[in-house]
């Protein structure tokens, strides 16, 4: 990991895939890698824990993330480069703003190149900003994220505010008092977002009936794979359980996760094996036992696939992990 200067309420770092569990403020996540190639992702975070945050990540790896968002805050994610990623089942597009309400269980498929700015504030503060900017408060279901795509002119105006605002907050981060509560620049930025959202199309762009169906199919299949990870899961069985053809399943997985069903199952098994291997020294588990626990029967192939995805052998993961 290469670090740039970090301060108590500010960090600007480059992280590998294993370190991305805290890349989103207010949202600790479980990360599963989806492909072997990666470069360090740049993560900039300015925050006053529990009060507000501004995240500016640029990801350079493919992964699946799942986590529960803060029960008292709302996140407004302004997408700069989408690169085929999805958040909460919403296919992202450039210049889209995704609103994630408090307490949402967030699922995301991140593709290399995704870049966004996420502002996190208490729900009550966002309601006040909406009321002042638009004269109305938008009711949001606790578990229902939404998205609008901004007009080009509004999107450019929003983008122009982000970097200067982040630089200003970084400079002020040596004085915790200045950043304890949402700064005026952040409030003005959120006001501009509220205005832009109010005049944008309020339907959820990209969520056509067919796209929504494919997302539901892929997520149902993902749940089934998790529940039966110790078992053999041929694609025929998966299709039968979900009630779709092999072609439909293939399309649903590539549209949602960017990989085939077989590649997804293999990656999920390898990621689960990695989690178990990091505690294997304390629990006394062997590489063979861990592989069997996640439904892997070909140990030679397992070692090669594991090294390809994580850059080290299963035994190296065990030895590198700290004993409890």
Range-by-range predicted roles:
Residues 2-34, 38, 84-229, 234-236, ...:
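Alpha-helical bundle regulatory/interaction domains
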Residues 36-40, 44, 48-69:
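Conserved short histidine dyad/triad with adjacent acidic residue
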Residues 58-63, 79-83, 100-104:
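Short acidic (Asp/Glu) patches
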Residues 68-84:
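Short, conserved beta-strand element in jelly-roll/cupin
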Residues 249, 253, 301-302, 306:
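Short hydrophobic/aromatic patch on the recognition helix
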Residues 254, 293-297, 307:
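A short, basic/aromatic helix-end/turn motif that makes direct DNA contacts
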Residues 255-256, 308-309, 320:
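Alpha-helical DNA-recognition elements
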Residues 263-266, 270:
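An amphipathic alpha-helix adjacent to DNA-recognition modules
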């Amino acid at each position: 990991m290469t670090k740039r200067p970090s301060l108590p309420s500010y960090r600007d770092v480059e992280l590998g895939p294993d370190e991305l569990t805290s890349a989103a403020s207010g949202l600790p996540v479980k990360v599963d890698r989806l492909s072997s190639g990666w470069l360090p992702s740049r993560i900039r975070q300015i925050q006053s824990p529990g009060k507000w945050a501004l995240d500016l990540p640029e990801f350079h790896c493919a992964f699946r993330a799942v986590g529960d968002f803060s029960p008292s805050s709302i996140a407004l994610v302004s997408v700069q480069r989408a690169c085929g990623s999805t958040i909460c089942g919403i296919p992202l597009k450039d210049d889209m703003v995704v609103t994630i309400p408090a307490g949402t269980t967030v699922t995301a498929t991140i593709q290399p190149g995704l870049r966004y700015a996420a502002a996190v504030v208490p729900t009550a503060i966002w309601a006040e900003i909406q009321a002042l900017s638009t004269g109305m408060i938008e009711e949001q279901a606790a578990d229902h994220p939404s998205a609008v795509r901004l007009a080009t002119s509004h999107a450019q105006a929003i983008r122009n505010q982000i970097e200067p605002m982040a630089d200003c907050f970084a400079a002020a981060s040596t004085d915790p008092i200045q950043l304890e509560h949402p700064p005026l620049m952040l409030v003005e930025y959120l006001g501009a977002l509220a205005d832009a959202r109010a005049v944008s199309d309020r339907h959820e762009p990209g969520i056509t009936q067919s796209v929504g169906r494919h997302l539901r199919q892929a997520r149902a299949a993902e749940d089934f794979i998790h529940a039966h990870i110790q078992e053999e899961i041929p694609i025929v069985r998966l299709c039968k359980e979900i009630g779709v053809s092999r072609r439909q399943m293939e399309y649903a997985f590539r549209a949602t996760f960017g990989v085939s069903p077989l590649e997804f199952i293999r990656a999920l098994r390898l990621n689960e094996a990695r989690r178990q291997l990091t505690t294997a020294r304390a629990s006394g588990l062997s590489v063979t036992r861990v592989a069997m626990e996640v439904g892997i029967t070909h140990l030679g192939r397992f070692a090669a696939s594991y090294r390809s995805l994580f850059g080290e052998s299963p035994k190296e993961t065990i030895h590198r992990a700290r004993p409890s």
